[in-house]
Amino acid sequence: MSIAKNPVLSGFYPDPSICRVGEDYYMVNSSFAYFPGIPVFHSRDLAHWEQIGNALDREEQLPLSGSEISRGIFAPTIRYHEGTYYIITTNVDHGGNFVITAQDPKGPWSVPHYLGDAAEGIDPSLFFDEDGKCYYVGTRPNPSGVRHNGDWEIWIEELDLHAMCLKGAGTAVWKGALKDCIWPEGPHLYKKDGWYYLMIAEGGTGPEHSISIARSRSLREWFCGCKRNPIFTHRNLGRDYPVIYAGHGDLVDDADGNWYVVMLASRPCEGHCSIGRETFLAKVEWEDGWPVINPGIGHLTEKTELPIGEYRLEREVTHADFIAFDQKKIDDRLLSLQRRDENAYSLIERKGFLRMHLKKQKLTEKTDAQYFGLRQKDYDFTFSACMEFDAERENEQAGIVCYQNHANHLSMRICGGKEKRKLQVIAHITENDTLLAEEEINAKGMLELYLKAAGQRAEFFVRDEEGKVLKPVSYTHLTLPTILR
């Protein structure tokens, strides 16, 4: 018996997709315009996870130049077939839908095989039928004309894995459960007991988000929806419920025939979901040929008992992240913006340190500014970074930041100066700077920049080399215009 604590992946881990190979489970998530892209996770009990790499970890795989932070890589699907792992996903501004492959989920993963204009839409998925054929399951705008925002449909076409192209124009199979529903997306196809099951998200990633399902005896026929659709949603629980926006699920079974679903949801704080969409887990039972998610409960729970033996991992994902720069490569958990300039940092110039060279690009621009970031996993947290920064020019800056996008972030930075350095706290909101606090710094050498957050409020501190806490710099509200990251 193992106990999964929800969310099983805390913080910015949206659009989960999962597959099982023997006793091992592998899961991936969207990464948008961050580099590297598509984190890959491994588990043996669905409760404890470790990150084993990033599928898109080379610049040749991941063109993101100029992308908004919420664009980039959307909704990957991971599948396994005859010794090969497949991930299909969308780079919304650079090439569209593509497939990458690997013999080991740790990588290396191949360069993208772009599927071209024929594979339109977003959130593609792959399905391997019993005869070995591979099918592309996608979304696209209503070909008869889009009547309203989100008027899309789900379609299927066979995929030639050797040529990496679709074999035909595709067959529309469903438009979602509700009449005139918006954004039928995130499709996943399964086969069970002679039926093909198509599970999708609909309602948009917001208060109306949900999971719906349909089935058919043939892939080329219209799918009939479950009469209980949507089969899962939190839309009826109200905006103040601790977990909202539940949807976009992917099913998986265990070796004993038990079923589960992973999905995204968000935990709001003071009306904002500023840590993004997270990955949750629920149990599934089949009744009358249809899946029932968390039967007898009907909503996501804080803990889920699983009929799988507990299996602990050496590098389990936890709520506490500690990064020591004593390795030869950057930690898989660290993210950069759009790309990572290998000449702009070093782990060997000073042993035990990450040396970050100054760049002209700014965090206020949609560029690859100098940035290494960790996902925020909770609303109550502390974060600190030890830093040496002895620049003398006034336009040279370094520090820490709570980053949501180029237009909205909160930073504490050391600014260079000919005589004395300054420490500033700046709120950059809707592309405008507000100086919240400014202090002169007399201390030299190593400084520890320290942030303590509680809910949507944060207090900043600075410690010198002797551990002395300098004057608190600012106490401020963290709530910025919310985007669903």
Which sequence ranges carry the predicted segments?
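Short carbohydrate-recognition loop motifs
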Residues: I348-T364
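Secretory/extracellular carbohydrate-interaction modules
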Residues: L363-K420
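Structural motif
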Residues: P36-G37, G95-F98, V146-W155, P207-I213, ...
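Carbohydrate-binding surfaces in secreted/extracellular proteins
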Residues: A385, L449-S474
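Conserved small/polar residues in nucleotide/adenosyl-binding loops
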Residues: T476-T482
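Blade-edge beta-strand/turn elements of extracellular beta-propeller
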Residues: S2-V8, W49-L64, I100-A118, E158-I182, ...
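Short, aromatic/His-centered strand-loop micro-motif at the edge of beta-sheets
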Residues: I429-E448
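Hydrophobic core segments of beta-strands in well-ordered, beta-rich domains
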Residues: C19-Y34, F74-V92, V99-I100, P112-L115, ...
